[in-house]
UniProtKB/Swiss-Prot annotation:
Residues 75-102, 118-194, 273-335 are annotated as: Disordered. Phosphorylated; phosphorylation is constitutive and occurs in the absence of any DNA-damaging stimulus. Phosphorylation is necessary for its nuclear retention. One of its GO terms (cellular component) is nucleus. GO terms for molecular function: chromatin binding. Residues 286-297 have a biased composition (Basic and acidic residues). This is MRN complex-interacting protein. Residues 129-142, 177-194 have a biased composition (Polar residues). Residues 203-230 are annotated as: Necessary for the association with the MRN complex. One of its GO terms (biological process) is protein localization to chromatin.
């Protein structure tokens, strides 16, 4: 009879399960549970196949019991640590809750009921005063205790909310009217300013144009050849301070020459002639090609300022100052 084949008990390195395998020449074997290929390292038993299988069952049972014991020990250790950590916390919480009740009534033991009632009565008005002061504090910034006096006027300063809209408008209109009257009083002759006053003051005060700020500009030698305010398209505007200064300087130097009436035109009265309507001319007698002022003009043609003669008879416009520009000659710089 052939001898029975020998078997050996092996243990997988990955799943740690005991199993029986037949003895082979090669040292390589494969796990029956997880299929892991591995080499022979240690044999836990050798014998017949039946004996090796019974031995494998015993080893696996022992391994299962050991793993269960280890898991139980681990769980017990974790539960014990949690209980140990929770024990002092619960003890502290209980110690905090326990003395909280006697703290409220600890000092009340030594006090009489009458004293307690008196203390409660005293505390109520104090609370009322605190509430009243807290209610008054938000409104205190809006109502200061002391009024601030204005150092310039000597009157208490008012806030913008205290002033009415009507008072602000009246002040604004008063400033506009005073500025307008001040600039009108600084104007030229009363004969020319009366017509302008009547036209400008015909508008309501709140629609009047704001007074133009006068700039002290240096006088220029070409300012005398500029248009007069009467010849400009805006007849109601007053002459600029620059033109007034140049005209007054010409009057002071005595370089003014009276303009003779041209043939075919009406003559103006010298009494109502404004000072800004007078201009200076330089004598240039050596040039024969210059157009003289005595040349006759057509009666039906309009004037140089763009208005017909019929309107000129109704109202005398101021004298023209730009006649030098019609000569067609260059100006001399030594004026």
């Amino acid at each position: 009879m052939a001898p029975a084949q020998q078997s050996r008990v092996l243990r997988c390195c990955s799943c740690h399960i005991f199993q029986a395998h037949q003895v082979k020449k090669s040292l390589k074997w494969t796990c029956k549970a997880c299929g892991e290929k591995q080499s022979f390292v240690r044999a836990y038993g050798e014998g017949s196949g039946a004996d090796c299988r019974r031995h494998v069952q015993k080893l696996n049972l022992l391994q299962g019991q050991v793993s269960e014991l280890s898991l139980r020990s681990v769980e017990e250790a974790v539960n014990g640590s949690e209980e140990e950590n929770a024990g002092p916390l619960q003890a502290e919480a209980g110690s905090q809750q326990a003395p909280s009740k006697p703290l409220e009534s600890r000092w009340l033991k030594y006090l009489d009921k009458g004293c307690e009632d008196q203390e409660l009565d005293r505390g109520r008005p104090a609370l009322k005063t605190q509430l009243s002061t807290s209610a008054e504090r938000p409104s205190s910034p809006a109502q200061p205790r002391k009024r601030k006096w204005n150092q310039r006027t000597g009157q208490p300063a008012h806030s913008l909310h205290g002033q009415g809209v009507d008072s602000v408008e009246d002040n604004f209109e008063h400033q506009d009217s005073t500025g307008l009257f001040g600039t009108e009083q600084q104007g030229t002759s009363p004969a020319l300013s009366t017509a302008n006053h009547t036209r400008e003051l015909g508008f309501p005060r709140w629609k009047l144009p704001s007074p133009v700020t006068q700039v002290n500009a240096p006088s220029s030698k070409w300012a005398r050849f500029l248009l007069a305010p009467g010849n400009s398209p805006q007849v109601d505007e007053k002459p600029s301070p620059l033109q007034e200064a140049t005209m007054l300087a010409d009057l002071a130097q005595g370089t003014v020459e009276n303009k003779t009436p041209v043939e075919g035109h009406f003559s103006r009265a010298p009494a109502i002639r404004p000072p800004q309507a007078i201009h200076t001319t330089t004598p240039q007698l050596d040039r024969p090609d210059r157009k003289t002022r005595e040349q006759p003009r057509d009666m039906g043609t309009p004037r140089a300022d763009g208005r017909p003669l019929a309107q000129g008879t109704q109202k005398a416009p101021p004298l023209q100052l730009h006649n030098l520009f019609t000569t067609g000659e260059d100006f001399d710089d030594d004026l």
